[in-house]
Structure formats: structure tokens, C-alpha cells
């Protein structure tokens, strides 16, 4: 096992209540099997409640408190990375999804991003632009992480790639609003 990612909703149920103890348990596992960088091998995917769910003051308070705790832990390198899934943002991007299709769509989207990066990092090529060590370095950099995939329509222009990348970072399905100037790592595969 190279990495453990704990997935939890932060609205105040069992996910929010168990996420930090599960992070600690996963770190103990890596220490037990002899890994010295346990905190760098455990990450968290935290999903924010929708606006409708946050109509409950209890849910809104629980989510705020848990995300504050997770962000502090990620910033102090207690685990890496913290990936925040903004369910309300996804709901707005896919307004016609039924309740039954909503959660599988979110889950497939996030797991699909990991799948793409796993495939790209392990693809044989004469030109190695993103190898497993690069992927590992990005995953081990502390703090919050955003991921995205985009096509480049105007790849022959001087700014086509940078415009596509900028657009993707601004419209990622994951949570947004991060100051990218404070990023400690980045990876791009064209």
C-alpha cells in the first residue's frame, strides 16, 4: 500500500466524526509497516454539504468546524493532501441530475481524476513528463490540492495551453477560491 485516502462528508455524521481518528489510524498503520513518512502517505477527501443541507444551523456549524480543523491539520503537515469536494458547486454544474444520479456522478468524477493521473504517471514513453515520483511529490506536498483535466483546443497558439490550464483551475469540480500563488507544488501534463 502506497497511500491511504480517507473520504468523509463533514456535515456532522459519522464521516465528519471519524475522519481525524481514521487519519491517525492510517498513519499508525504506515508507521507499523516501517514507513517513515506516514503523514505524507495519508490524505483526506472532504465533501462539503450543499446549500440546502446547510440550511440546518447544526450542519453548517459542523461543516465549518470540521473543515477548519482539517485545513489546520493539512497546513501543519499532519496529512497530505486535503482535497475538498464542493457538492453545491457540482450541483450547480449538473442541475438536471436526479438525487439518485448525483452521488455516483460526484464519486466517479473524483475517482476518475485519480485514475487519469495514475495512468499518466505510469505510461511508458520516450518522453517522461510526469512519472510516478512526480505524482508522489505532488501528493506529498502539504495543504489543499485541486485536480483537473481539460482539453486544449487551440494548442498551436502561443497562449492556448496556458488559457486552457487557467480555465480549468478556475472551473474545477473540486472546491475553488484558493490563492494559487501560495501553492507549493504543481503538475501539468499536456
Functional labels for PLM-detected ranges:
Residues 1-190:
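Tubulin/FtsZ superfamily GTPase core signature
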